[in-house]
Amino acid sequence: MEITASLVKELRERTGAGMMECKKALVENAGDIDAAAEWLRKSGLAKADKKADRVAAEGRIATAQAGGKAVLVEVNSETDFVAKDENFLAFTDVVANAALNSDATDADALKSVKLDSGETIEERRAAVIAKVGENLQVRRLVRIDSANNVAAYVHGGRIGVLVELKGGDAELARGIAMHIAAMNPPHVKASDVPAEFVAKEKEIELAKMSEKDKAKPAEILEKIISGKISKIVNEVTLYGQPYVLNTDQTVEQAVKAAGAEVIGFQRLAVGEGIEKVVEDYAAEVMKQAGLA
C-alpha cells in the first residue's frame, strides 16, 4: 500500500508522534493506520521504560476548574528545558483537563483515564516521552469538589493552590490562594496545629529562657511562654499570618470582614520532596543534545 502524505498527517494528528516516526510506523504495518498507531504506542512505551529510572524533578503545575470543581496536577520532567517545551506544556494541560473530567483522586488512578483520542494518559505520556527524550512523570493530583467558593491559582507554573471558602467572592478566594502560594502556611487556624508541635515549642522556648526569667513567678512565666507560642502559631497558620495583599490585617481579619470562612486548601510546588541529581553544565548540554 502506498504511504501517502495525508495518511502520515492523519497518524500524526492521532498520535502526536513525529513525521518520520509516523511514516516508519505505516511502512512497518503495511499502511494500516490503527496498527501503526498501536505500533507507535508500543514503541513509545519501550522508550519510556528505558528512561524510567531517571530523576524527574523539574516540571509544571497545571490546573483546570469548572465552578466549585478544581484540580491541580504536577507533571515532572528531568530538565527545566523540557519543562518549557510546547509538547510538554500541552501534555500537562491535557492531564489537568482529563483529571477534572474524571473521578480520579490520585496520580495512579489518572494513568488509565481515557482521552478523547481513545488513548489513556499513560499512553499519551509514553508518546510525549518519545518526542522530548526525557523521563516524564505524572506525580501528583489534588482536587476539590464543592458547592462552596473555590479558587485555583498557579504561580509561574511552579506553585499551585486550590482553596475552598464558605462565603466571600471570587476576588477574595483568589487573593487567599495567592497568599497561600507565597507564604506556604501548614495549617488554616490555631486549632489545626498539632498539640505535639505546641508542646515541643514550649519546651524549646523554656530551654532558651535565661535563669533570671525562669525564676519569675509561675503566672508571669506562663504569660511569657504563651506570648511566644502564640507568635509561633500565628507564623504556621493561614489565619495568623499578615495578609500579603493588605499587611495591615491578618488573613483571618480579611476573611471575617467578608463574612467568609476558609474550609481548606491544597498547595503543590514542583519537585518538592524529590532529591535532585546535581550535574555540571557540560553534562546538561550533552543530555539536551542527545549525547548522554
Swiss-Prot record:
Classification via SUPFAM superfamilies: Elongation factor Ts (EF-Ts), dimerisation domain, UBA-like
Superkingdom in the source lineage: Bacteria
MF-aspect GO terms: translation elongation factor activity
Localization terms from the record: Cytoplasm
Record bears the keyword Magnesium: no
Annotated stretches, region: Involved in Mg(2+) ion dislocation from EF-Tu: 79-82
Cellular-component GO terms for this entry: cytoplasm
One of the GO biological process terms: translational elongation
Pfam families attached to this UniProt entry: EF_TS (PF00889)
The keyword Protein biosynthesis belongs to this UniProt entry's keyword annotation: yes
Alphabetical UniProt keywords: Cytoplasm, Elongation factor, Protein biosynthesis
Function: Associates with the EF-Tu.GDP complex and induces the exchange of GDP to GTP. It remains bound to the aminoacyl-tRNA.EF-Tu.GTP complex up to the GTP hydrolysis stage on the ribosome.
PANTHER family xref list: ELONGATION FACTOR TS (PTHR11741), ELONGATION FACTOR TS, MITOCHONDRIAL (PTHR11741:SF0)
Family from the record: Belongs to the EF-Ts family.
HAMAP family: EF_Ts
Name of the protein described by the UniProt record: Elongation factor Ts
